[in-house]
């Protein structure tokens, strides 16, 4: 296996204006499954920072009062106390749509002001396409005097309400409003990646490119500009400290940072035509798949994305697609619900038509039977290539919003049979296989130490095992829940097909508002990313 077989080359990245490396070697990547694990680790790392260290972060939503541990501190307390110790705290939070539209305008502003009052600088950033968002979830911690301790976190977990859940999936005691089908404290499944080594420098560069971009923070929003002027908001980022050298190599993982930036006017200085390495990176990896693609995704929308999977399934008769998605959208209502449903129904239908016996889609519930909201954005291909990020499998994430993902290739082979799933000589890799197995052990109620992994290694056996467990749990529910609950938390996912009258308006609303296209016109016409 060569890294170029899986990772994008500089030419394939197609963004020469960015200073981001093509990929980095010698890293150590660790998946942190669930918000409780991530928040606990983040508290430990931030509390160890001292004067002159760097704390940079980007976020889609930030709730200042979200408790990082059961007894605190809150997000605002953790970052404000760091600033008070002399840590250089800088943040970019999306300037959200109005709270009246079920977004987080006021929460993001409150977090910004709380950290600013302590000596940090957190800016509300609206340098996106109209109707778009900054969806990256990143924290970079640099210690210029001790670079070996530098660490960064990237993935799907925001610093906000509803995220501090664990494997028990009782939900976060501080919930956000969601569909009532998820209960008063919605169970939440998510993944964040902790990385050390030279990739921390690449993620630092990602933050710095956005921070130093000369485009106005409230671009194309005169109302936001007026409100900011009246409130005395910080609209001009202060200079950042000099970027430290990359941390030294520390592990066997090659990491490629993948991003989405839309084509906008004025242009991003670091991505004049936008950047779509998320879409290109997934496309390259999926086209190399031969036996198993495993996804966890919040949406799994878009016919353009589904066509990629459908083509792979058509070309490779031994390939299986296994996906774990939410049972219900996070919203309810006569107007909001149908556009959320129609995109997934279209995408899954396209995949099923390509290979009806080899597409396996599940949703998750906790042991009380409450559905778990799947917010994770994870992809594992043939137990070789794996990614964790902020991006969903839809056109919005691949073209329209800002997104950030880390793809990982491990030098360390996993010698358990089958040692080479695809037969291409790549060989199963420890990081990718362990990530898939950790997730499946939880979903199937298997031994977390791996003692019950034997039927989860070979793709055909694994698909049979996961399907049998989901069907058995389904039968238990259908039978009135009589007798002991079978092990496992997965149920077969059955998307509801909307009536044709509803589809008439839901489909255009979905394509124009919920899943828009941020590509330049020439890329749209060519059907390329």
Q: What role is predicted for each listed range?
A:
Residues 1-529:
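Charged, low-complexity intrinsically disordered terminal segments
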């Amino acid at each position: 296996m060569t890294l170029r077989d899986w990772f994008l080359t500089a030419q394939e990245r197609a963004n020469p204006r960015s200073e981001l490396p093509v990929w980095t070697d010698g890293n150590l990547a660790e998946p942190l499954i669930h918000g409780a694990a991530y928040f606990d680790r983040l508290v430990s790392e931030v509390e160890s920072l001292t004067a002159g260290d760097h704390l940079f972060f980007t976020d889609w939503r930030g709730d200042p009062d979200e408790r990082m541990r059961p007894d605190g501190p809150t997000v605002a307390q953790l970052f404000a106390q760091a600033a008070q110790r002399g840590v250089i705290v800088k943040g970019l939070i999306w300037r959200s749509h109005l709270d009246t539209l079920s977004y987080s305008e006021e929460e993001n502003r409150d977090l910004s002001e709380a950290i600013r009052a302590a000596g940090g600088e957190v800016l509300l950033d609206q340098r996106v396409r109209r109707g778009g968002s900054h969806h990256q979830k990143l924290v970079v911690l640099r210690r210029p005097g001790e670079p070996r301790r530098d660490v960064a976190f990237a993935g799907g977990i925001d610093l906000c309400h509803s995220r501090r859940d664990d494997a028990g999936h009782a939900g976060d005691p501080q919930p956000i409003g969601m569909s009532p089908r998820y209960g008063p404290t919605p169970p939440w499944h998510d993944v964040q990646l902790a990385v050390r080594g030279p990739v921390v420098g690449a993620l630092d560069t990602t933050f710095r490119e956005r921070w130093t971009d000369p485009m106005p923070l409230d671009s194309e929003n005169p109302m936001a500009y007026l409100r900011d002027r009246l409130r005395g908001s910080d609209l001009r980022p202060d200079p950042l400290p000099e970027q430290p050298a990359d941390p030294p190599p520390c592990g066997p993982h090659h990491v490629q940072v993948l991003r989405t930036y839309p084509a906008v006017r004025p242009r991003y200085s670091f991505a004049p035509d936008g950047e779509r390495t998320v879409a290109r990176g997934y496309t390259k990896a999926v086209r190399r798949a031969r036996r198993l693609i495993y996804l966890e995704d919040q949406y799994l929308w878009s016919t353009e994305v589904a066509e990629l999977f459908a083509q792979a399934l058509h070309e490779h008769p031994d390939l299986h697609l296994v996906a774990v998605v939410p049972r219900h959208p996070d919203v309810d209502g006569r107007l909001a619900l149908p556009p959320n449903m129609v995109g997934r129904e279209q995408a899954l239908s396209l995949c099923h038509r390509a290979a009806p016996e080899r597409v396996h889609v599940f949703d998750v519930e906790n042991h009380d039977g409450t559905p778990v909201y799947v917010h994770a954005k994870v992809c594992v291909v043939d137990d070789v290539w794996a990614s964790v990020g902020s991006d969903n499998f839809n056109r919005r994430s691949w073209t329209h919003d800002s997104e950030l993902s880390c793809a990982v290739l491990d030098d360390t082979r996993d010698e358990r049979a089958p040692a080479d799933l695809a037969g291409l000589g790549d060989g199963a890799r420890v990081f990718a296989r362990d990530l898939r197995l950790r997730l499946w052990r939880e979903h199937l109620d298997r031994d977390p130490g791996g003692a019950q992994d034997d039927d989860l290694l070979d793709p055909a056996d694994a698909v049979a095992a996961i399907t049998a467990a989901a069907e058995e749990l389904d039968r238990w529910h259908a039978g009135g829940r009589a007798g002991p609950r079978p092990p496992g938390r997965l149920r077969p996912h059955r998307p509801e097909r909307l009536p044709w009258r509803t589809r008439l308006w839901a489909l255009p609303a979905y394509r124009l508002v919920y899943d828009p296209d941020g590509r330049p016109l020439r890329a749209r016409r060519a059907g390329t990313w």
